Structure formats: structure tokens, C-alpha cells
Amino acid sequence: MYEYLKGLVTAVNPYYVVLEVQGIGYQLQVANPYRYTESMSEVVQIFVHQAVRDTDITLFGFYDLDEKQLFQKLISVSGIGPKSALAILANSDHSGLIQAIMNDDIGYLTKFPGVGKKTAQQIALDLKGKLGDLEQSATLVGQTAIDLGSQGDSPELSDALAALSALGYSAREVKAITPKLTDFAAQTTDQYLREGLRLLMKK
């Protein structure tokens, strides 16, 4: 069982990142792959959860230990698989997620892709009062907007839209926010993706 891997980020795409460790490239499925774009070819530490099935072994990567622990809590809930858990964690407002669980805010929880009312209620039921130190350590990650004007159909925007689809948002949902993202002042795919998630959570 792995706790974390430390190596070079050699590839980033909408579904995963590749981390090269001592000549071996590990494919890590992560909540927001483009978070690692600025770390390309740099040594980073990524926390890891290993899932073993009859047909494959999948590695899930996390920015820090809190994110990993929150993922493990989420997949313990009936109806929440690894893909759904990653889609939930893609929204960097983990403190908002934890507050929603503690306050039985079902409306907030159903905004995540693949989470209906029944599953949202199950999340609150199973995890309320069981998050321990996560409730104290969760932090709100702010977004930084760079004043560059409209970016049009930039490669960064296209990558962000693909990443939203990979997280499970429907084509209709992604299309609805595309005009706002086109006008959003951003420089990187990660910034577009964070803004897209913020807009989808407001629906």
C-alpha cells in the first residue's frame, strides 16, 4: 500500500496525471489534473490511494493528506464510487463540502455530478460527526483572476471544458456555462476549471 509518491510530473490530461518515479511512469487519477500544470517537470509529492479490483489496479492521487482522507471517507458511503468522489473533490471548496455534510445541506450536495437527493442524504447520514480533524483543517482555496480580457476559444479553455466533462458533468451543463467562461479573465486551464466548477455549483 502506498502513502505517497514523489517524482516528476511528465503529463497532464483531463483524466489523470503521469508521475515519473525512478524511471517508472505512474498514472494517477486526480480530482483536478490541471492543478499540476505549473509543476510540470518538477519534483512533487502526491498522496496516493490504491484501489484493487479483479480486473485492474487503479491509483488515485491527492494534493495533500486531507484531500486523501476526505476521498476515503466519501468512498465509504454507499452509492459513492471513486469517480464520484473525485468529481466532488474537484471543487476546491472542501470546507464548504464539510460544512454541508455537518449541516445536512442536501441542496448543496446534490449540485455535484452523479449525486441525487438519496445519495446526498446518505453522505450526510454516514459522514456527519465522523470527519474528525478534517472539519478543523479543511480550508477554502481562493481563486485568482488575471486581468487578460476575453480569451476566446483558447486551448486552456478547451482543456477545462474537457476536464468538466471527464468529471461527469453533462454536455448541457458544460454548454450552459461556456459563454461565461469565454469571457472569464484567465490564463491557465486550472483557473478556467476552478471558475467552471464555481459556476456549476451556483446552478
Curated annotation (Swiss-Prot):
Coiled coil: none annotated. One of its GO terms (cellular component) is cytoplasm. GO terms for molecular function: ATP binding; four-way junction DNA binding; four-way junction helicase activity. Transmembrane segments: none annotated. Residues 153-203 are annotated as: Domain III. InterPro entries: DNA_helicase_Holl-junc_RuvA_I, Hlx-hairpin-Hlx_DNA-bd_motif, NA-bd_OB-fold, RuvA, RuvA_2-like, RuvA_C, RuvA_C_sf. Residues 143-153 are annotated as: Flexible linker. It comes from the Bacteria. Residues 1-63 are annotated as: Domain I. It is found in: Cytoplasm. Gene3D superfamilies: 5' to 3' exonuclease, C-terminal subdomain, Nucleic acid-binding proteins. CDD domains: UBA_RuvA_C (cd14332). Homotetramer. Forms an RuvA(8)-RuvB(12)-Holliday junction (HJ) complex. HJ DNA is sandwiched between 2 RuvA tetramers; dsDNA enters through RuvA and exits via RuvB. An RuvB hexamer assembles on each DNA strand where it exits the tetramer. Each RuvB hexamer is contacted by two RuvA subunits (via domain III) on 2 adjacent RuvB subunits; this complex drives branch migration. In the full resolvosome a probable DNA-RuvA(4)-RuvB(12)-RuvC(2) complex forms which resolves the HJ. Has three domains with a flexible linker between the domains II and III and assumes an 'L' shape. Domain III is highly mobile and contacts RuvB. HAMAP family: DNA_HJ_migration_RuvA. Belongs to the RuvA family. This is Holliday junction branch migration complex subunit RuvA. It comes from Latilactobacillus sakei subsp. sakei (strain 23K). The lineage of its organism: Bacteria, Bacillati, Bacillota, Bacilli, Lactobacillales. The gene is ruvA.
